[in-house]
Protein backbone atom coordinates (compact mmCIF):
# COMPACT_ATOMS: atom_id res chain seq x y z
CA UNK A 1 0.00 0.00 0.00
CA UNK A 2 2.85 2.39 0.82
CA UNK A 3 4.38 1.72 -2.55
CA UNK A 4 1.10 2.49 -4.33
CA UNK A 5 0.62 5.71 -2.34
CA UNK A 6 4.15 6.76 -3.21
CA UNK A 7 3.38 6.24 -6.89
CA UNK A 8 0.08 8.11 -6.85
CA UNK A 9 1.48 11.04 -4.84
CA UNK A 10 4.27 11.68 -7.34
CA UNK A 11 4.63 15.15 -8.81
CA UNK A 12 6.73 16.18 -11.76
CA UNK A 13 8.23 19.36 -13.15
CA UNK A 14 7.73 20.05 -16.86
CA UNK A 15 10.95 21.64 -18.09
CA UNK A 16 9.32 22.72 -21.35
CA UNK A 17 10.89 25.81 -22.90
CA UNK A 18 12.85 27.01 -19.85
CA UNK A 19 16.04 26.97 -21.93
CA UNK A 20 14.71 30.07 -23.73
CA UNK A 21 13.59 32.51 -20.99
CA UNK A 22 14.14 35.52 -23.25
CA UNK A 23 11.59 34.11 -25.72
CA UNK A 24 8.97 33.33 -23.07
CA UNK A 25 6.55 36.14 -23.97
CA UNK A 26 6.95 35.66 -27.72
CA UNK A 27 6.39 31.89 -27.48
CA UNK A 28 3.33 32.44 -25.29
CA UNK A 29 1.79 34.81 -27.85
CA UNK A 30 2.62 32.50 -30.79
CA UNK A 31 1.26 29.34 -29.16
CA UNK A 32 -1.82 31.19 -27.85
CA UNK A 33 -2.59 32.35 -31.39
CA UNK A 34 -2.04 28.83 -32.75
CA UNK A 35 -4.34 27.38 -30.08
CA UNK A 36 -7.09 29.92 -30.81
CA UNK A 37 -6.93 29.37 -34.58
CA UNK A 38 -6.80 25.58 -34.10
CA UNK A 39 -9.92 25.51 -31.93
CA UNK A 40 -11.87 27.93 -34.13
CA UNK A 41 -10.82 26.11 -37.32
CA UNK A 42 -11.54 22.58 -36.12
CA UNK A 43 -14.71 23.24 -34.13
CA UNK A 44 -15.93 25.54 -36.90
CA UNK A 45 -15.42 22.72 -39.41
CA UNK A 46 -17.29 20.29 -37.12
CA UNK A 47 -20.20 22.74 -36.78
CA UNK A 48 -20.23 23.39 -40.54
CA UNK A 49 -20.41 19.67 -41.37
CA UNK A 50 -23.13 18.82 -38.87
CA UNK A 51 -25.27 21.90 -39.60
CA UNK A 52 -25.18 21.64 -43.41
CA UNK A 53 -27.20 18.58 -44.45
CA UNK A 54 -25.54 18.09 -47.83
CA UNK A 55 -22.19 17.58 -46.05
CA UNK A 56 -23.55 14.65 -44.03
CA UNK A 57 -21.80 12.08 -46.25
CA UNK A 58 -19.24 9.47 -45.10
CA UNK A 59 -16.26 11.56 -46.23
CA UNK A 60 -17.37 14.63 -44.26
CA UNK A 61 -18.49 12.60 -41.23
CA UNK A 62 -14.96 11.16 -41.03
CA UNK A 63 -13.52 14.64 -41.56
CA UNK A 64 -15.70 16.10 -38.82
CA UNK A 65 -14.57 13.45 -36.34
CA UNK A 66 -10.94 14.00 -37.37
CA UNK A 67 -11.36 17.72 -36.65
CA UNK A 68 -12.93 16.86 -33.28
CA UNK A 69 -9.93 14.68 -32.37
CA UNK A 70 -7.52 17.42 -33.48
CA UNK A 71 -9.32 19.76 -31.06
CA UNK A 72 -8.96 17.13 -28.32
CA UNK A 73 -5.24 16.79 -29.05
CA UNK A 74 -4.72 20.55 -28.87
CA UNK A 75 -6.76 20.83 -25.64
CA UNK A 76 -4.76 18.03 -24.02
CA UNK A 77 -1.40 19.72 -24.53
CA UNK A 78 -1.59 23.47 -25.14
CA UNK A 79 -3.41 24.93 -22.07
CA UNK A 80 -0.92 23.42 -19.58
CA UNK A 81 1.98 24.47 -21.78
CA UNK A 82 0.71 28.08 -21.89
CA UNK A 83 0.22 28.07 -18.10
CA UNK A 84 3.81 26.90 -17.56
CA UNK A 85 5.28 29.84 -19.48
CA UNK A 86 4.53 32.07 -16.47
CA UNK A 87 4.40 29.46 -13.70
CA UNK A 88 7.23 29.42 -11.17
CA UNK A 89 7.04 25.74 -10.17
CA UNK A 90 5.65 24.16 -13.43
CA UNK A 91 4.43 21.19 -11.35
CA UNK A 92 2.12 18.53 -12.76
CA UNK A 93 0.74 15.67 -10.66
CA UNK A 94 0.67 12.04 -11.74
CA UNK A 95 -3.12 12.27 -12.07
CA UNK A 96 -2.76 15.26 -14.44
CA UNK A 97 -0.04 13.38 -16.31
CA UNK A 98 -2.32 10.40 -16.77
CA UNK A 99 -5.23 12.57 -17.91
CA UNK A 100 -3.04 14.53 -20.34
CA UNK A 101 -1.54 11.42 -21.89
CA UNK A 102 -4.93 9.66 -22.01
CA UNK A 103 -6.54 12.40 -24.13
CA UNK A 104 -3.46 12.80 -26.32
CA UNK A 105 -3.21 9.05 -26.95
CA UNK A 106 -6.98 8.87 -27.55
CA UNK A 107 -6.76 11.65 -30.15
CA UNK A 108 -3.68 10.29 -31.94
CA UNK A 109 -4.87 6.66 -32.03
CA UNK A 110 -8.34 7.64 -33.22
CA UNK A 111 -6.72 9.87 -35.86
CA UNK A 112 -4.76 6.87 -37.17
CA UNK A 113 -7.93 4.84 -37.68
CA UNK A 114 -9.91 7.79 -39.06
CA UNK A 115 -7.20 8.54 -41.63
CA UNK A 116 -7.27 4.87 -42.66
CA UNK A 117 -11.07 4.89 -43.00
CA UNK A 118 -10.87 8.10 -45.05
CA UNK A 119 -8.36 6.42 -47.39
CA UNK A 120 -10.72 3.45 -47.78
CA UNK A 121 -13.60 5.85 -48.44
CA UNK A 122 -11.59 7.53 -51.23
CA UNK A 123 -10.72 4.09 -52.64
CA UNK A 124 -14.40 3.10 -52.84
CA UNK A 125 -15.41 6.49 -54.31
CA UNK A 126 -12.81 6.35 -57.11
CA UNK A 127 -12.44 2.61 -57.79
CA UNK A 128 -16.09 1.59 -57.27
CA UNK A 129 -18.16 4.75 -57.86
CA UNK A 130 -21.33 2.89 -58.87
CA UNK A 131 -21.30 0.78 -55.69
CA UNK A 132 -20.25 3.66 -53.41
CA UNK A 133 -23.56 4.10 -51.59
CA UNK A 134 -23.83 0.34 -51.07
CA UNK A 135 -20.24 -0.24 -49.96
CA UNK A 136 -20.07 2.94 -47.83
CA UNK A 137 -23.51 2.96 -46.26
CA UNK A 138 -24.32 5.29 -43.36
CA UNK A 139 -24.47 2.26 -41.03
CA UNK A 140 -20.96 1.15 -42.02
CA UNK A 141 -19.72 4.74 -41.69
CA UNK A 142 -21.07 4.98 -38.12
CA UNK A 143 -19.60 1.58 -37.24
CA UNK A 144 -16.17 2.53 -38.57
CA UNK A 145 -16.21 5.86 -36.72
CA UNK A 146 -17.39 4.22 -33.49
CA UNK A 147 -14.73 1.53 -33.91
CA UNK A 148 -12.02 4.18 -34.27
CA UNK A 149 -13.13 5.86 -31.02
CA UNK A 150 -13.34 2.52 -29.18
CA UNK A 151 -9.86 1.52 -30.35
CA UNK A 152 -8.44 4.89 -29.30
CA UNK A 153 -10.11 4.67 -25.89
CA UNK A 154 -8.95 1.09 -25.25
CA UNK A 155 -5.38 1.82 -26.37
CA UNK A 156 -5.18 4.88 -24.09
CA UNK A 157 -6.67 3.09 -21.07
CA UNK A 158 -4.17 0.22 -21.35
CA UNK A 159 -1.11 2.50 -21.26
CA UNK A 160 -2.54 4.84 -18.62
CA UNK A 161 -3.57 1.89 -16.43
CA UNK A 162 -0.07 0.40 -16.63
CA UNK A 163 1.37 3.65 -15.24
CA UNK A 164 -0.11 2.67 -11.86
CA UNK A 165 2.41 -0.17 -11.51
CA UNK A 166 5.34 2.27 -11.65
CA UNK A 167 6.99 4.13 -8.76
CA UNK A 168 8.99 7.30 -9.30
CA UNK A 169 12.00 7.85 -7.05
CA UNK A 170 14.47 9.43 -9.47
CA UNK A 171 14.60 13.00 -10.72
CA UNK A 172 11.09 14.41 -11.13
CA UNK A 173 12.05 16.64 -14.06
CA UNK A 174 10.37 15.80 -17.36
CA UNK A 175 12.35 17.25 -20.26
CA UNK A 176 9.28 17.96 -22.33
CA UNK A 177 6.49 20.53 -22.66
CA UNK A 178 3.79 17.93 -21.89
CA UNK A 179 3.57 14.73 -19.88
CA UNK A 180 4.39 12.06 -22.43
CA UNK A 181 4.70 8.42 -21.45
CA UNK A 182 8.27 7.73 -22.63
CA UNK A 183 9.88 10.50 -20.51
CA UNK A 184 7.91 9.10 -17.54
CA UNK A 185 9.43 5.65 -18.09
CA UNK A 186 12.89 7.22 -17.85
CA UNK A 187 12.04 8.51 -14.36
CA UNK A 188 10.66 5.22 -13.03
CA UNK A 189 12.57 3.24 -10.40
CA UNK A 190 10.32 0.26 -11.22
CA UNK A 191 11.38 -1.71 -14.29
CA UNK A 192 9.15 -0.35 -17.11
CA UNK A 193 9.87 -3.31 -19.42
CA UNK A 194 6.25 -4.54 -19.28
CA UNK A 195 5.00 -1.04 -20.13
CA UNK A 196 7.43 -0.79 -23.05
CA UNK A 197 6.43 -4.28 -24.21
CA UNK A 198 2.78 -3.18 -24.28
CA UNK A 199 3.77 -0.29 -26.56
CA UNK A 200 5.26 -2.79 -29.01
CA UNK A 201 2.31 -5.17 -28.70
CA UNK A 202 -0.41 -2.54 -29.25
CA UNK A 203 1.09 0.58 -30.86
CA UNK A 204 3.16 -1.05 -33.59
CA UNK A 205 0.31 -3.26 -34.94
CA UNK A 206 -1.95 -0.19 -34.98
CA UNK A 207 0.63 1.72 -37.04
CA UNK A 208 1.23 -1.22 -39.39
CA UNK A 209 -2.50 -1.84 -39.94
CA UNK A 210 -3.46 1.81 -40.54
CA UNK A 211 -0.43 2.62 -42.71
CA UNK A 212 -0.98 -0.55 -44.76
CA UNK A 213 -4.66 0.37 -45.24
CA UNK A 214 -3.69 3.84 -46.48
CA UNK A 215 -0.93 2.56 -48.81
CA UNK A 216 -3.05 -0.24 -50.32
CA UNK A 217 -5.99 2.14 -50.82
CA UNK A 218 -3.82 4.70 -52.60
CA UNK A 219 -2.07 2.05 -54.69
CA UNK A 220 -5.48 0.87 -55.95
CA UNK A 221 -6.51 4.50 -56.53
CA UNK A 222 -3.36 5.19 -58.58
CA UNK A 223 -3.89 2.08 -60.72
CA UNK A 224 -7.50 3.13 -61.36
CA UNK A 225 -6.55 6.75 -62.15
CA UNK A 226 -3.85 5.72 -64.64
CA UNK A 227 -6.45 3.63 -66.49
CA UNK A 228 -8.77 6.63 -66.88
CA UNK A 229 -8.87 8.05 -70.41
CA UNK A 230 -10.36 11.39 -69.43
CA UNK A 231 -7.91 14.06 -68.24
CA UNK A 232 -10.77 15.76 -66.42
CA UNK A 233 -11.51 12.52 -64.54
CA UNK A 234 -7.85 12.14 -63.57
CA UNK A 235 -7.68 15.73 -62.39
CA UNK A 236 -10.83 15.35 -60.31
CA UNK A 237 -9.54 12.11 -58.74
CA UNK A 238 -6.17 13.64 -57.87
CA UNK A 239 -7.87 16.74 -56.48
CA UNK A 240 -10.15 14.59 -54.31
CA UNK A 241 -7.23 12.66 -52.80
CA UNK A 242 -4.55 15.38 -52.63
CA UNK A 243 -5.59 16.98 -49.34
CA UNK A 244 -6.05 13.65 -47.54
CA UNK A 245 -2.74 12.25 -48.83
CA UNK A 246 -0.90 15.42 -47.74
CA UNK A 247 -2.46 15.24 -44.27
CA UNK A 248 -1.67 11.51 -43.92
CA UNK A 249 1.94 11.99 -45.06
CA UNK A 250 2.65 14.82 -42.60
CA UNK A 251 0.92 12.98 -39.73
CA UNK A 252 2.71 9.65 -40.14
CA UNK A 253 6.15 11.11 -40.89
CA UNK A 254 6.02 13.17 -37.68
CA UNK A 255 4.54 10.33 -35.63
CA UNK A 256 7.13 7.78 -36.79
CA UNK A 257 9.95 10.27 -36.16
CA UNK A 258 8.61 10.94 -32.67
CA UNK A 259 8.15 7.33 -31.55
CA UNK A 260 11.63 6.43 -32.83
CA UNK A 261 14.32 5.66 -30.23
CA UNK A 262 15.70 8.67 -28.36
CA UNK A 263 17.66 8.87 -25.14
CA UNK A 264 16.70 12.41 -24.21
CA UNK A 265 13.16 13.75 -24.24
CA UNK A 266 14.16 17.29 -25.20
CA UNK A 267 15.42 16.02 -28.57
CA UNK A 268 11.83 14.99 -29.33
CA UNK A 269 10.44 18.48 -28.66
CA UNK A 270 10.53 19.95 -32.23
CA UNK A 271 8.79 16.90 -33.73
CA UNK A 272 6.31 16.78 -30.82
CA UNK A 273 5.43 20.45 -31.40
CA UNK A 274 4.69 19.64 -35.02
CA UNK A 275 2.52 16.56 -34.50
CA UNK A 276 0.72 17.69 -31.32
CA UNK A 277 0.26 21.41 -32.07
CA UNK A 278 0.97 22.29 -35.71
CA UNK A 279 -0.83 19.38 -37.44
CA UNK A 280 -4.15 20.08 -35.65
CA UNK A 281 -3.73 23.69 -36.83
CA UNK A 282 -3.06 22.74 -40.47
CA UNK A 283 -5.69 20.03 -41.00
CA UNK A 284 -8.79 22.31 -41.25
CA UNK A 285 -7.02 24.45 -43.85
CA UNK A 286 -5.62 21.47 -45.80
CA UNK A 287 -9.09 19.93 -46.09
CA UNK A 288 -11.06 23.16 -46.57
CA UNK A 289 -9.05 25.36 -48.94
CA UNK A 290 -9.11 22.79 -51.78
CA UNK A 291 -12.65 21.60 -51.07
CA UNK A 292 -15.24 23.28 -53.28
CA UNK A 293 -18.22 22.00 -51.27
CA UNK A 294 -16.89 23.40 -47.98
CA UNK A 295 -15.97 26.70 -49.66
CA UNK A 296 -19.43 26.97 -51.25
CA UNK A 297 -21.10 26.35 -47.87
CA UNK A 298 -18.89 29.03 -46.29
CA UNK A 299 -19.81 31.47 -49.07
CA UNK A 300 -23.49 30.69 -48.54
CA UNK A 301 -23.17 31.36 -44.80
CA UNK A 302 -21.32 34.62 -45.47
CA UNK A 303 -24.01 35.73 -47.94
CA UNK A 304 -26.75 34.94 -45.42
CA UNK A 305 -24.80 36.80 -42.73
CA UNK A 306 -24.43 39.88 -44.97
CA UNK A 307 -28.14 39.78 -45.85
CA UNK A 308 -29.04 39.52 -42.15
CA UNK A 309 -26.66 42.37 -41.34
CA UNK A 310 -28.18 44.60 -44.03
CA UNK A 311 -31.71 43.72 -42.88
CA UNK A 312 -30.82 44.66 -39.29
CA UNK A 313 -29.30 47.96 -40.49
CA UNK A 314 -32.45 48.83 -42.46
CA UNK A 315 -34.65 47.89 -39.48
CA UNK A 316 -32.57 50.15 -37.22
CA UNK A 317 -32.98 53.05 -39.66
CA UNK A 318 -36.77 52.62 -39.60
CA UNK A 319 -36.73 52.55 -35.80
CA UNK A 320 -34.65 55.75 -35.67
CA UNK A 321 -36.96 57.66 -38.04
Curated annotation (Swiss-Prot):
Disulfide bonds join 97-179. Signal peptide: none annotated. SUPFAM superfamilies: Family A G protein-coupled receptor-like. GO terms for cellular component: plasma membrane. Its main location: membrane. It is found in: Cell membrane. It is a multi-pass membrane protein. Keywords: Cell membrane, Disulfide bond, G-protein coupled receptor, Glycoprotein, Membrane, Olfaction, Receptor, Sensory transduction, Transducer, Transmembrane, Transmembrane helix. This is Olfactory receptor 5K4. The gene is OR5K4.
Amino acid sequence: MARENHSLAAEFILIGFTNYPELKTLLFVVFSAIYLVTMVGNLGLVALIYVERRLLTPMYIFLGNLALMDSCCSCAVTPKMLENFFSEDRIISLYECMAQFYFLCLAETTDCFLLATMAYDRYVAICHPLQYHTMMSKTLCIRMTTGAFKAGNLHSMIHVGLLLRLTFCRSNKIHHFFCDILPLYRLSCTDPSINELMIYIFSIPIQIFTIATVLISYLCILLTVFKMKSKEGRGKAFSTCASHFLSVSIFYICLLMYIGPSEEGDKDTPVAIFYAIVIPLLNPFIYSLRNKEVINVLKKIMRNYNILKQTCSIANLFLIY
